[in-house]
Amino acid sequence: MKKILISLISLIILTACVSTRYSYYPVSSYGINKISISAGLISEEDENSPVEYIGISDVRSNVDEPHKVKILSSSIKIIDKNKEYIVKTNPKSGYIYIYKQGVVITDDFKTYIGKVQLDGGTIIDIPPLSFKKNVYVESYNPVTDTINAGARTKRLFNGTIDEYREWKNK
């Protein structure tokens, strides 16, 4: 009985995991509150993973009522480490797949997307945006999360990569 109890306690304690996810967000939204812009990585768990896409979505969108965003520019400009890239867009998609077009970005970058149109007809001219790498770190335990549904994952950190390195070294 004692061995079972020790095994059970060890299982609960030793199965805790920490999940770290990386992504890019604009430093400032420049007052644009109708759309959300972010950039996703090929592998969000790898700090050095290149950017796969830039996504633009309508903040009104939800599962029951999706709203589309149409990129009006045929291409966008991306500046990374003083290199300038011109990337083609797909007017039928709110995503700009930059990695598929041979652009490899692993650091902070700037982009000019231009104009987008919401499905209601509203046109928004997005100013040049500076993207910074962000980190989201959470702790979870599959065993205790299952037993106690009210005590799910715990956010440990959410911020830029520079803030994360400073937090990690404390």
Predicted regions and their residues:
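Sec-dependent bacterial lipoprotein signal peptides
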Residues: 1-20
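Small side chains
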Residues: 7-10, 39, 55, 114
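Bacterial Sec signal peptide processing site at the extreme N-terminus
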Residues: 14-34
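Short, solvent-exposed mixed-charge patches
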Residues: 19, 168-170
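Short, surface-exposed binding/anchoring microloops in extracellular/periplasmic proteins
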Residues: 38-76
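Short, solvent-exposed, Trp/other aromatic-anchored flexible loops in extracytoplasmic proteins
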Residues: 50-51, 82-139
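Short beta-strand elements
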Residues: 121-167
